[in-house]
Amino acid sequence: MTDMRRLGQRAKQASLLIAPLSTQIKNRFLSTLAKALVDDTQTLLAANQKDLANAKEHGISDIMMDRLRLTSERIKAIAQGVQQVADLADPIGQVIKGYTNLDGLKILQKRVPLGVIAMIFESRPNVSVDAFSLAFKTNNAIILRGGKDALHSNKALVKLIRQSLEKSGITPDAVQLVEDPSHAVAEELMQATDYVDVLIPRGGAKLIQTVKEKAKVPVIETGVGNVHIYVDAQADLDMATNIVINAKTKRPSVCNAAEGLVIHEAVAARFIPMLEKAINQVQPVEWRADDKALPLFEQAVPAKAEDFETEFLDYIMSVKVVSSLEEAISWINQHTSHHSEAIITRDIKAAETFQDLVDAAAVYVNASTRFTDGFVFGLGAEIGISTQKMHARGPMDLEALTSTKFYINGDGHIRE
């Protein structure tokens, strides 16, 4: 029996053991875990330093190092996130509908756990805790497989969670970490249909594509953010400037950061110099511009076809000039990763058309795409941003980690 198979068996058994846990027990444990994270900050930072040292040795960029880095403040924020999950309403057992049918059967549809969730993710060690807390709150066991660059951090975090579970009298196998970073083991997890009920990949386009090609278990796609902002002919250009600066430069390494700028030709000659001057005062950006946009920049490079398909996660942005709203919508739908898209305009009809026709989980009017986030949407914590349409779409909250079951009660009923 392989290690992955043993891990899967333990996760399946754990899912049955935690399925009956009450809301009170779950919330009490999550509060305990939140405190333990803060109390054990120095141990977690020491583990993270090993990952940072390895990353530096391998020449990882400063932006990617930032994704990997833990600090006392970040650990405190992770702990606060766990407590916020404890404070959320528990969806498990919620009655969606109930009725008595014509045969006199009493029928209830309730929310129930999915069972075993597997998560494959990259870089950010906070995902270990975020994903566990959401899975635990919904009575799911979880198998975590992080990137090798965050292995020491993930091991320390999962060890702390397992110790806390054991001290609370709860099976520590409610969370398990795949420590082998090999692709073969990851592929085995993707195909563990006997044990895994759903797989959630969270990372870059290459990871998502690999999972889509290799997985045999059900998959919920998340994460890739080839996000666009369209500056319409009727845009407030000051507003557009502020929004683009925020969406591109505030945190370029996150999936809701803007990667592509689409501009109506009626305002391009005014807007591009205005934006370039303003953004250079905050954080210079490398512009990869099409033929119409290129001569309007003081400093830019010609865009290649692949630039319009790329999630840069850096201070780089593609630029496309279009002649109409319809062309903008068509261009975005051709290149979007279906995450978040935005239009800047004072034209109400254009805004409504854009929101109706752009194929993305979140579509903004006159706002930064950086708001696509479970907490910001008032949903509480999220396990990722789903970019597909089935089961869940957009920020995945607690309800997205549940299924439903019909409970039918009769009194000797038989069907004639």
UniProtKB/Swiss-Prot annotation:
Transmembrane segments: none annotated. Pathway: Amino-acid biosynthesis; L-proline biosynthesis; L-glutamate 5-semialdehyde from L-glutamate: step 2/2. Pfam families: Aldedh (PF00171). Keywords: Amino-acid biosynthesis, Cytoplasm, NADP, Oxidoreductase, Proline biosynthesis. It comes from the Bacteria. One of its GO terms (molecular function) is NADP binding. It catalyses: L-glutamate 5-semialdehyde + phosphate + NADP(+) = L-glutamyl 5-phosphate + NADPH + H(+). The keyword Oxidoreductase applies. GO terms for cellular component: cytoplasm. It is found in: Cytoplasm. Belongs to the gamma-glutamyl phosphate reductase family. Catalyzes the NADPH-dependent reduction of L-glutamate 5-phosphate into L-glutamate 5-semialdehyde and phosphate. The product spontaneously undergoes cyclization to form 1-pyrroline-5-carboxylate. This is Gamma-glutamyl phosphate reductase. It comes from Streptococcus pyogenes serotype M12 (strain MGAS9429). The gene is proA.
